[in-house]
Amino acid sequence: MKRGFARPTPEKAPVIKPENIVLPTPLSIPPPEGKPWWLIVVGVVVVGLLGGMVAMVFASGSHVFGGVGSIFPIFMMVGIMMMMFRSVGAGGQQQMSRPKLDAMRAQFMLMLDMLRETAQESADSMDSNYRWFHPAPSTLAAAVGSPRMWERKPDGKDLNFGVVRVGVGMTRPEVTWGEPQNMPTDIELEPVTGKALQEFGRYQSVVYNLPKMISLLVEPWYALVGEREQALGLMRAIICQLTFSHGPDHVQFIVVSSDLAEWEWVKWLPHFGDSRRYDAAGNARMVYSSVREFAAEQGELFAGRGSFTPRHASSSAQTPTPHTVIICDVDDPQWEYVISAEGVDGVTFFDLTGSPMWTNVPERKLEFDKTGVIEALPRDRDTWMVIDDNAWFFALTDHVSIAEAEEFGQKLAQWRLAEAYEEIGQRVAHIGARDILAYYGIDDPGNIDFDYLWGSRTDSMGRSRLRAPFGNRSDNGELLFLDMKSLDEGGDGPHGVMSGTTGSGKSTLVRTVIESLMLGHPPEELQFVLADLKGGSAVKPFAGVPHVSRIITDLEEDQALMERFLDALWGEIARRKAICDSAGVDDAKEYNSVRGRMRARGQDMAPLPMLVVVIDEFYEWFRIMPTAVDVLDSIGRQGRAYWIHLMMASQTIESRAEKLMENMGYRLVLKARTAGAAQAAGVPNAVNLPAQAGLGYFRKSLEDIIRFQAEFLWRDYFQPGITVDGEEAPVLVHSIDYIRPQLFTNSFTPLEVTVGGPEIDKVVAHANGEVVEEVEAEAEEEGIRVPKVGTVIIDQLRRINFEPYRLWQPPLTQPVAIDDLVNRFLGHPWQKEYGSARNLVFPIGVIDRPFKHDQPPWTVDTSGPGSNVLILGAGGSGKTTALQTLISSAALTHTPDQVQFYCLAYSSTALTTVSKLPHVGEVAGPTDPYGVRRTVAELLALVRERKRSFLEYGIASMEMFRRRKFGGEAGPVPNDGFGDVYLVIDNYRALAEENEVLIEQVNLIINQGPSFGVHVVVTADRESELRPPVRSGFGSRVELRLAAVEDAKLVRSRFAKDVPVKPGRGMVAVNYVRLDSDPQAGLHTLVARPAMGSTPTNVFECDSVVAAVSRLTTSQAPPVRRLPASFGVDQVRQLAARDTRQGVGVGGIAWAISELDLQPVYLNFAENSHLMVTGRRECGRTTTLATIMSEIGRLYAPGATSVPAPPPGQPSAQVWLIDPRRQLLTALGSNYVERFAYNLDGVQAMMGELAAVLAGREPPPGLSAEELLSRSWWSGPEIFLIVDDIQQLPPGFDSPLHKAAPWVNRAADVGLHVIVTRSFGGWSSAGSDPMLRALHQANAPLLVMDADPDEGFIRGKMKGGPLPRGRGLLMAEDTGVFVQVALTEVRK
């Protein structure tokens, strides 16, 4: 039997250690210097003087130098000579002593020894590296079957692909030599160290006895020139080298020789087999006796091929495979018709004939002598380029004998590329219990006793755990098992992959494995999570089975779902780890062992079943989300200890899954579409499988690869022993074809006919005694009339009452109904104990926590620091729906007495759907500006009233208020008719742009309201749309899909970008402890649907909520009080009589009611003595003056000079009236009206008189402070200058009113009150009138009635606008309030 070989991951080769060696500098000895000239002169002079002295001594007859004394002249002469010839000065100091020179030589030699060791280490690393990739041919036979076999890869990264050793020779080392510094000259060079350095460089510049290689990808052919035996020995060595290191799928060989006996040994090598032709001995051997025969059989090899392209000139890094090596051992001129001078692309020739056709190209010639010395043109080691035109010594040739080659070939013949499973007979007879159902003892799939089935499997912690049959071996028909346990438990897992192209039966195999595991394990022990990147045809049939925790499909549609799925798996690992930690154990196996013992004692523990995660089409996942490879790899590594098993399936596997494949145990590989996919799956031969569904390879390890036929459980179901026609089924008996033994030679051996057993039809799948001849590749439609075995089993499994742990919640695609959400939040139906909630927490949606496997309610807590709520989101993000949901949620959890809502709908009309809720007091929008103003005014008045009443009743906080009013705590509470009140503003910016005055009031409520139970809920596109003073006033925050992620505060902006563009989707921060997560990472949220669950899923109106709540409560939120369209002066007076307020002018002229509190508005002379009124025609300006004059008559005594003075202490009034239209003549009698004018002359005259009167009231100089405060310098009535339609008087310096204008700012000193009306047209130019200008300077209140907003700002940032008759905006310095003027009849 042949053995399969699957290429393992290449082992790590020894690394070449490049070195950088700087040569040391040899010793330097400078030449000696000459004697100074003066020394010679001095010496000659001294010698001469000494000689003269001696001569004189002898001439004088003295005996000083006689006897012993004669020695002194001799010493003097010797001393002078030594002084002259010794080294002196600098020249003498440069001479080196011999001991010192020897020491320095020894030091230099030691340095060379150290460098020699460094260079030798680099050379040794080169030797190890070269011999790793190119071992001696004599060692190859022993290495056959080792992981080193067939390791070359044509991927462009393996630079040794196509490179083959031919001998050993010399190579320059991987050493960079640095020149010595300060190299001495030849004269100064110390000879010993210089010679040593020269010899060191000579011997260390070459590495000896290293493999020498040639490349198949550099030249189109090589000519081996020399003695024939030498050439044949080298060729045999080359063949052995290439067939060992290159697989038969990468390199194939062809021999064309006239001496076929010489090449008989190559029949053993799979590389010589023709993959297209077969004979009785297998693949036909590509050995031919002539060029003609070769061309006839392999002519198509050259069809369409271009010229040979060297590797360094190719545009592609990858090498096309298989590369063909043709050995030319026949001298035939017909070769010229086969190959040109440029060669053939993808083909390398080796010529052994020495024909000139092959040898006339020097760079393609390897010439060797009898001693085996090869000479060739030298090439660059890295680029393979020829660097010299003269042949050099290249190598000592390798040589392999025929005996050695045949031994090598016979050993290699045992191996096929992942074909250990191939036998002569492939058809299998299924006899007895060789199928899944028989293994489990199931006679009738439609009637399974699961209690008995699972009860009989008592070794759930033993060998049978996660061990299930899935098909049959192709060689002997035995039942084949998949054991998903870890390798250390004797299994094939814990994780594995399954691959197969379309039509290979992958989906069927996935179903078979899953259902077989279900049959072997009860749901308490085994759970599945079935995920499919696409439609889920393979896993959808298992819906509702108690083993299945969740079926997840269509993951490829949204990458966020993929990340969510991975998060859920991480959460399951964390959950299981926590369970194990709580029991004090390390892994799931130990935990279940402890649990089993505890249950035997009657004490149960939390279950921890095995979890098989099936991911179909995972390759698509990696394509869409490349980081998933690393994540799944980590999940696989950490999950194995907690019984989490991954089973990955895909149509193809590519290199990007390489890291994940390292952690995969078993591999079920069906037919692959490409060689690359088969290679990546670990079974390269899968590409050669026939197109037969369910046929594949089961790879347990590198050497244990089994060919199998998967069982088809989705076959038609019939009762046992009955065919489709209702007849008794026949028993099928099969035999195996027999082929006679054949003599194995290089020659073609024709197939003989079979001699044993009957012919049988091709069997694709066998199951339970039935023969299934055709099987669909993917999931097929369920039969209408005939049920399937698999579905029959699944239907029975669905009847089991078991609820699995759900580790996957539905994605946030459909919003939950509001009543379902509230029920989930309360833990009981919302109608039960309705209104018993004592907090102000409202659920508005769900939070998706895939890591925790749940979706808790998303709540807004408005009872504490989060009293005000800000809802941020871009346009279309669902802000208005969030408001509807919040209000509906409050309505289902609180009574209308507890919470009330007042809404300003500036975004859309959707909020009007909550208007009928008993909790809602008002819904107003831009089409009802008055309703908007009244709503704000009402709540602002409530804040002010509660400020007062809380002090009065001793209420310290809203918590105390709620306890007293709704919790039964003793103590008084204000009877204002409100509980917690919510001002809801949909689109804060729109309101701010429309009404500057109103938005300031809203801001006041935002800052002050929460302390008194008045909350504000606003929506905005951007946080910057809020006014700066109130941006920090929102303690609760709802972030939907943001218009600008910079506004994100709950999560980091990089997470906020992931919120999908879907209404209602948002994000909150992680609200649980997760050590591996950013605390500001986001959790996705979805706002609930503001409708009851009984309504269709596309209904977002609140009518159903209104109906449901109205059935439980009869209370109603107080409506917003509105100013009446008409309000009489008597009614104002009645209100004024009951008014107890302070500081608002109570007791004065009451002329209107305020919309803030529906209380009277007074002319508060303590603050300002004047009033201006403007508005368009028929707005009620004159009526305003009539009402004020009526009040003057009510409050003041007549003050005209024609009547007697009133009693002391009673104030009196004197009216100076300018009425061009004469409508106010009857408002007051002549006893009040001092002067009256209706034309210019009369006005001028009257103003002169008034000026004289006022001048007389000027305070004289020298008054004391007491006199000034008491205004004792004048007496008399208060003077009211009332001017109607001042626009009819000349403006500017021609205005007759300029005479009285100087006293406007000193009105309090002279008792003057100016009340003026003017039409609104041209108000921007009203400053030219001296009286109006003076009133502006005095900050007189301005009542703007019906006006044109296009006039722009009138005072501050306040504008006018259309108003009903009698209504106006009373503007003070920087505030404004709408008032309704009391109606007084005016003479027409």
From Swiss-Prot:
Positions bound to ATP: 500-507, 873-880, 1175-1182
Record localization: Cell inner membrane
Disruption phenotype: Mutant does not secrete EsxN and PE_PGRS proteins, and has reduced levels of EccB5, EccD5 and EccE5.
Keywords carried by this UniProt record: ATP-binding, Cell inner membrane, Cell membrane, Membrane, Nucleotide-binding, Repeat, Transmembrane, Transmembrane helix, Transport
Any one annotated GO CC term: plasma membrane
Molecular function terms, GO-annotated: ATP binding; ATP hydrolysis activity; DNA binding
Membrane topology recorded in Swiss-Prot or TrEMBL: Multi-pass membrane protein
Chain segments annotated as transmembrane: 38-58, 65-85
All residue ranges annotated as the FtsK domain in the record: 477-679, 855-1049, 1158-1351
Principal place of residence: membrane
Entries under Pfam families matching the protein: FtsK_SpoIIIE (PF01580)
Role description: Part of the ESX-5 specialized secretion system, which is responsible for the secretion of EsxN and a number of PE_PGRS and PPE proteins. This component is essential for ESX-5 complex stability and secretion.
Subunit structure: Part of the ESX-5 / type VII secretion system (T7SS), which is composed of cytosolic and membrane components. The ESX-5 membrane complex is composed of EccB5, EccC5, EccD5 and EccE5.
Name of this protein: ESX-5 secretion system protein EccC5
